[in-house]
Amino acid sequence: MTAEEIKKKDSEYIMHTYGRFDIVLDQGKGATLWDADGKQYVDLTSGIGVNSLGHGNPAIVNAVTKQAEKLMHASNL
């Protein structure tokens, strides 16, 4: 999907409870992000997990992958 297609679906299906940046992020590594057009950003706005661990930390990716292979989700209901 193109960035414009993603933005259109976002406006149709996502409740906008807070302001958003007008970008479509594609990938991240450490504190660096890239949008769907390949433009690079330094991530100064993400949540606490990214602030302390960075995007794409190999140890975290490995741990999450291993856990997801065993159990993806367990409801507390």
PLM features per residue range, with description:
Residues 16, 20, 27, 35, ...:
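Generic structural "secondary-structure junction" signal
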Residues 1-29:
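Active-site-adjacent loop/helix segments that line or gate small-molecule/cofactor pockets in enzymes
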Residues 2-3, 32-37, 57-63:
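Short hydrophobic/aromatic-rich motifs at helix boundaries and adjacent loops
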Residues 23-43:
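Active-site and channel-lining beta-strand-loop segments
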Residues 40-77:
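Glycine-rich loop-to-alpha-helix module at the N-terminal edge of alpha/beta enzyme cores
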